[in-house]
Design a protein with these regions (language model features):
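N-terminal Rossmann-like NAD(P) cofactor-binding subdomain of oxidoreductases
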Residues: 1-119
């Protein structure tokens, strides 16, 4: 199943790094983080004041994060409604924003055909 990570703060970065470390990077379809630009996300993922430097195989090219041989779309939207979700694939959203904690706030994910949401 494809994975979308919404929020690349402390938890989102750790989820991203762990998926890559476990060789599951090809399952990551997209990341969304409203803070910074799309190209900033490579820097934020690579350098962490607590967890150190990571991601020798990570780079930002052509509007995407590339890890090893896999391209990951990057968005910088502030609301769920503005994120361009896939139309045909089943996907899991890992919401690491810390904001969307109630069923009502998670509804937009399911309206956009998310199969599962993990908060």
């Amino acid at each position: 199943m494809k994975i979308i990570i919404n929020g690349l703060g402390r938890i989102g970065k750790l989820v991203f790094r762990r998926l890559c470390d476990e060789n599951l990077h090809k399952n990551i379809l997209m990341v969304n983080e409203k803070a910074g630009t799309a190209s900033d996300q490579e820097y934020f993922l690579r350098y962490d004041t607590v967890h150190g430097t990571w991601g020798d195989d990570l780079c930002f090219e052509n509007g995407c994060l590339n890890y090893k041989d896999h391209s990951i779309d990057v968005m910088t939207e502030g609301s769920i409604e503005d994120i361009s979700f896939p139309k045909s694939e089943k996907f899991l959203v890992v919401d690491c924003t810390g904001v969307n904690k109630s069923e009502k706030l998670l509804e937009p994910y399911f309206e956009r055909k998310a199969s599962y949401v993990l908060i």
